[in-house]
Structures are given as C-alpha cells and as structure tokens.
Amino acid sequence: MIKCSGCGACSVICPKNCIAMKVNEDGFYRPKKNADECIDCNLCDEVCPQIHADGTNLDDITMYSAFAIEKRIRTESSSGGIAWLLAERAVELGYGICGVTYNYKEKRAEHKNFFELDGMRALKGSKYLQSICEPAFQDVLKELQFNCNRRFIIFGTPCQIAGINHVLIKKELRKRVALVDIFCHGTPSYLLWQKYWKWLDLDKGMKEGKKMILTFRDKTYSWHKYFMHITSTSKNEWGGVKEYLAERSEEHTSELQ
C-alpha cells in the first residue's frame, strides 16, 4: 500500500500471524504478508488507519497546554514532561505503561511495557525513529484479554495510536486503555540511521558494542537550540553545542573569505 505509514495495526490484528513488519528497500518498516497463510479475513484492512481515517475536528473539542512544574522533569524530557507525568500517575492508578525505548544493541526504537516505575526512565525523551511496536501491542492485548482488571496507557505516534485504537475497538477492549499520541513530523529512514552510526564509529570513535547514552533532544544549553547528544563509556562524546557552533563559525568564516 503506497500510503502505508507502518503503524503495525495489520500485524497486531492478524489471527494467523502472517503479517510481519520488515524493513523495505528505503529503510522503513512496512507490512509483508505471507499469502500462503492468509485466510482473507480482511481484519487488516478493517483496522488500517490509512483506509479508515477518523479525523478530529479541533473546533469541536477543548484543548489545553501544560508542562511539568518541576524543572528536572522538563530538562530530562524532550518537551514539557507531560507524558512522563501521565505515565507516573497511571502507574499509581494500577495501569500498565506501553511506551518507546531505545535498543542500543539493535540501534532501533522499540515499544516496551512496564508495570512499575523501575525501568521506566528508558521511556523518557523522544526517539526520532520508527519504533517496533507490534510485539508490545500484542502483549497489551493478551494482558487485557486474560485480566479483566488490567488497564493500560499507550504512547505512540499518531498513526500508531490510530491503528491500535481501531484494533482495541475491534477487540472490544478500548474502554480500558488510555491513548496518548505525540506530535510527529515523520521519521527518518533506518538506512540513514545506520550510515550515521557508521560515521560516528569511524570519525568520532563511537565503537560498536560500547554502552551509549543517547539523547535525541538534549536541552543542556537551551530549550529551543537543542541538539542530539551521544556519550559512550569510553568517554567519547558527540553532539556538544560548542562543537556545533565551532563548526558553524568555521563555515561562516570560510564563506566570508
């Protein structure tokens, strides 16, 4: 499907597990169907948010803007820290949390499920990559189906949330799940991400296999002039705003000469 956004809803709903999300030639996760296993139930089309777009008229709803009062939370978050506060409160109320972490070994973003605050710090901050959400979403469905008291809050991109919303409605589980989608301007290709890491390895000494601390939107120096910051256990560091400004200064100077 040309308009496919890679939300994974078709893979999650498939009763035969014959739809898998695979990286295509352009570096994006897209569904790949095993036609031999398909039973033509059409559930994949029924939950597809590209086929069934449920638009919201913003003039008909009340909207609020907010941010975390505690500066530490805002600093550690990509924006105002509201997602973290929602997750904290949800845990207190007994909800399971489904959000995005970064897998340093595989160098990709992945949805993970949590049921307590321990480990949830991995959810903090945006991951500007297409996340692998299907396994976590399927686990959410299993939890909801086998435990009538289980509730969840799911965080994701608009297409992922639209897709899982259709799945939950189809499964009659929607009432026990809170959905939170984030602003999204599109995700880069994993081919580009792989090339970037190769450059970091060769040019900046960020060797494969070493533990990294990756912040996609570091606000150490400024909220608006943010940058990506990467630190490894070998003390190599990349992304400091001083390095960036120095490079920009050199470029500007050379242009004037």
Residues covered by each model-derived region:
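Conserved SAM-binding loop
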Residues: 6, 40, 153-154
